């Protein structure tokens, strides 16, 4: 390895440099254009530093390291569309999706907001929004939801009537009202409990809302515009059980190991559940460190 004019040699190396989430051009190439002629990655926001460009991953790929994972798959969260391009952090995450409805730019629902507990689904919504026209979503709640979720740094758009809310969001008012009224009519009364998979659900509605479905009818009303927020990407180096990198053709590297997000694709294909990233880093950090030290001694 070279640092300026200095050359550093090692008997073994552990690469733990993360993904390529900050390289918008790479994201753009991976995602390509959608049917509407849009480049979805142009509307992605990066939750962390602007410097995670995947340079070590690129170098390893060029040197013959095998890869694993879909370059479009990532830990991708629905975050406030008003967040900065980089470094918005966790405070921009919108956590009220399961308490309301999520609409696209056509004022249509497009997925079950109550499918499962939030820690199992929060990193799904960014990708779902990325697949919508304009890569924009609108999370709509009413006064009943206030105080039941971690409030993001940006306040919700607040109005006293639903038509006012539609206009404030820039959505077609008649279509918005039709969507909300249809949803409200489909809600079945149950015992609301956000801590369990409760029996508040919809009937005869596509897509269904299977839990925590309550009518949006109590003023004031709130909306949060959201965009895809990329935390880390899943494309990475292929490794064996000892965290040793595998080369194209299947053979093991002589002295290269990987840990953390740069090899997360070995574990994560799509989707996410809270804490898996830290678990991958912790487990494979220990494995890679142990095996690299053993390799160097031998």
Show which residues each predicted segment covers.
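A glycine-rich dinucleotide-binding beta-alpha-beta segment and adjacent secondary-structure elements
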Residues: 177-266, 270
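Glycine-rich loop(s) and the adjacent beta-strand/alpha-helix scaffold that form part
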Residues: 8-80, 287
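An anion/pyrophosphate-binding glycine-rich loop and adjacent beta-alpha core
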Residues: 53, 57-177
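Short, small/polar residue-rich loop motifs at catalytic or cofactor-binding pockets
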Residues: 95-97, 231-233, 274
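Core beta-strand elements of the Rossmann-like FAD/NAD(P) dinucleotide-binding domain
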Residues: 2-12, 251-253
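Short acidic, glycine/proline-rich loop/turn micro-motifs
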Residues: 25-29, 151, 267-272
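An active-site-proximal "capping" alpha-helix that borders the catalytic cofactor pocket
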Residues: 56-63, 277-295
